[in-house]
C-alpha cells in the first residue's frame, strides 16, 4: 500500500461520490449509464486557477435531469461517447471566462446546460436529431460552418420546470457573435 500511496499522492474521500486526490476533486458519480458528474464539471481553467467547480446537491439534480433527458438519449441513439467541452460552471468560473453568471451552465433555477459534440457525427445532423427527438429548453448550433461537418458544437439546456424548445444558430459576423432562430 505504501508504494501505491507514494505513486498516487495523498487522497481522501470527500463524501457522496467525490474523491480528493492531491487537492483535486474527482466527481465519479454516475448520473446515467454513460454520463458521469466528472464529465460535466471538468474545467482546465478551474484547475489552473484553483477554482472549486463542484456543484451543490441542487445543482447536481439539475445536471442529472440534463443527463437523463438529453445527454444519455443522444449517447444511446448514436452508441458513441459525447465529448463535453463545457458543462457545469460555478459563478466564479463564469466570471473568469467572461460568461454570464446567469448562464444555464451554472445549473441554478432547475435548469442545466452542456456544450458537446460526437466525433465522426456531423454537428448539424446531431442538432437536427436532437431537435426532432428530444425536449430541450434551448438548443444552439454554435459556429457550424457549412461543408465542415466537425466544425462548431451543440449547446443544449434542459429545465426540470418547463422547456421552451428554442433553437438558435450562433455565427460570428464581423467579429461579433450573432444568434438567429435555427429552422432548417
Model-inferred region functions:
Residues 11-13:
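Aromatic (phenylalanine/tyrosine) cluster motif
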Residues 17, 27, 104, 108-112, ...:
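Catalytic cores and adjacent binding grooves of peptidoglycan-active enzymes
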Residues 69-99:
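Extended, low-complexity, intrinsically disordered C-terminal regulatory tails
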Amino acid at each position: 500500500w505504501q508504494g501505491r500511496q507514494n505513486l498516487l499522492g495523498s487522497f481522501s474521500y470527500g463524501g457522496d461520490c467525490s474523491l480528493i486526490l492531491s487537492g483535486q476533486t474527482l466527481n465519479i458519480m454516475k448520473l446515467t449509464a454513460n454520463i458521469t458528474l466528472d464529465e460535466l464539471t471538468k474545467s482546465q481553467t478551474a484547475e489552473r486557477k484553483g477554482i472549486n467547480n463542484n456543484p451543490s446537491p441542487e445543482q447536481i439534480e439539475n445536471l442529472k435531469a440534463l443527463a437523463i433527458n438529453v445527454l444519455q438519449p443522444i449517447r444511446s441513439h448514436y452508441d458513441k461517447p459525447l465529448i463535453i467541452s463545457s458543462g457545469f460552471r460555478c459563478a466564479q468560473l463564469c466570471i473568469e471566462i467572461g460568461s454570464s453568471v446567469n448562464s444555464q451552465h451554472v445549473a441554478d433555477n432547475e435548469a442545466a446546460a452542456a456544450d458537446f459534440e460526437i466525433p465522426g457525427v456531423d454537428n448539424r445532423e446531431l442538432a437536427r436529431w436532437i431537435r426532432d427527438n428530444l425536449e430541450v429548453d434551448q438548443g444552439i448550433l454554435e459556429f457550424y460552418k457549412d461543408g465542415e461537418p466537425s466544425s462548431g458544437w451543440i449547446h443544449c439546456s434542459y429545465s426540470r420546470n418547463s422547456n421552451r424548445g428554442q433553437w438558435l444558430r450562433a455565427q460570428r459576423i464581423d467579429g461579433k457573435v450573432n444568434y438567429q432562430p435555427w429552422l432548417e
